[in-house]
Every structure is written in C-alpha cells, then in structure tokens.
Amino acid sequence: MSHFAFEQIGVIRSPYKEKFAVPRQPGLVKHGGGELHLLTPYNQPDAVRGLEAFSHLWVLFVFHQTMEGGWRPTVRPPRLGGNTRMGVFATRSTFRPNPIGMSLVELKGIRCHKDQVILQLGSLDLVDGTPVVDIKPYLPFAEALPDAQASYAQHAPAATVAVTFTAELASSLALLEKRYPHFAAFVQEVLSQDPRPAYRKEEEPGKTYAVWLHDVNVRWRVVDGGFEVFALEPR
C-alpha cells in the first residue's frame, strides 16, 4: 500500500468558529462568506495568476477536527434523519479513511498585498482554521451535469425552521450590523437549517442551544416549533 504526504497550502477564515451549525454544503447560507489565506511559500501572486477569470473554485481541505476519530465503513447521513446507515463512500461524511473534503465555492475576488495572497470567497461550509491542501478552478462544461442522479441528496435541503429575535435584542443587533453587515440575516440563515443532531429534533419546547458565529455567542431556544434568539454575547 502506498502512502503520500501533502503540505498545507492555505487556511480558511470563516465566521464559523466551531463545527456545530456549520452548513452541510456551501451555498445554503448566503451571507456566510469567508477567505482563503495562502501560506508560505505558496503565497505568491504568480501562483494565482489567471484565477480571477474563474467564478468558482474547488477547495480541497482536511477534516482536521474529526480525523482523530478514524474512519467508519458505514455512517448515518443527516439528510436521512440520522437513522439509516449508508456506506461511507456513498456519503460526504467526515469519517473517511483519508480525512479529505472538497467544497465548491464562489470566488469573489483576490487580494495581494506584500506577502499576503487572500482569496475572497462566497458562501462557505468550512469552520474557521480549516487547513487547505489544494484549490482548482471549477469547469462548468465538464462538471455541471444536469442529468446526474444523487440518490437521497438530489435537491438542496429547504430551510425548515422559522427564526426570530426577542425584542430586547434590537439595540444589540443594530450594533452588530455595523461590525458585521447582514448579521441578523446571517444568523437566521444558519439557524433555519436546523443544526441540531437529528436525534434531538423532537426535544421539548424551551430547550436552549448556543453557537459562536463571528465573535458572538448566539443563544436560542425552541419555541412553538421555531427558534427564538434571546442572547447575543460578543467575546
């Protein structure tokens, strides 16, 4: 059996500071963009020459927060309610023999300054600090296949949960919107995807949850089948 060693070429900077509530695919949270910072010695403008002519990129990365758990031959995809087992190679689970993921993201711009090369990205599904091992331009003629079949994931999941904020958060939201434009919409988009594990989605009303988005601890509770955000606690 052959073994290969790869070097990290970059790192992701995103508003998702923990695994919980990271979208399961890119494009689901419109306001959840981020950046890819190239590392030395790959942070050279020549390395991205011509990349600005492409609208989207494949980002290949490492599942660095789950790799210690090893791989599993079968997993339970969230899209199937967390109860049905599928072979790991029939899913995009993080528990793979090689902890490599791939994400298709929009390239919104490239910023080069001194020793920095930063790719500005659209909607992400990656946690802050994710190691990147390669990037490749997306080629629509070869990779957009309208007749492709995708079993249980043929269509994007619909936002399933209504998200509201308590009236007491109005002033806090106004301040956060100045620091993070569209912050309220971002929080609603993230939570509307219902990040709870499938086995917890039948929990009693009033159950509370929290997640770090940007540098804000967002706390919410289950109310009448929806989510009510009741606290926004900056770090």
Residue ranges and their predicted role:
Residues 2-8, 95-105, 214:
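Short coil-to-beta-strand transition motifs
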Residues 17, 110-116, 225:
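Short, conserved beta-turn/loop elements at beta-strand boundaries and strand-helix junctions
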Residues 114-124, 228-231:
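Short, solvent-exposed secondary-structure boundary/capping segments
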Residues 49-101, 193, 201-205:
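Active-site-adjacent substructure of cysteine-protease-like catalytic cores
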Residues 1-45, 51-53, 140-190:
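Arg/Lys-rich, positively charged N-terminal/basic patches that mediate binding to nucleic acids
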Residues 52-55, 158-235:
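Basic, Lys/Arg-enriched alpha-helical interface segments
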Residues 119-153:
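Flexible glycine-rich active-site/ligand-binding loops centered on an Asp-His dyad
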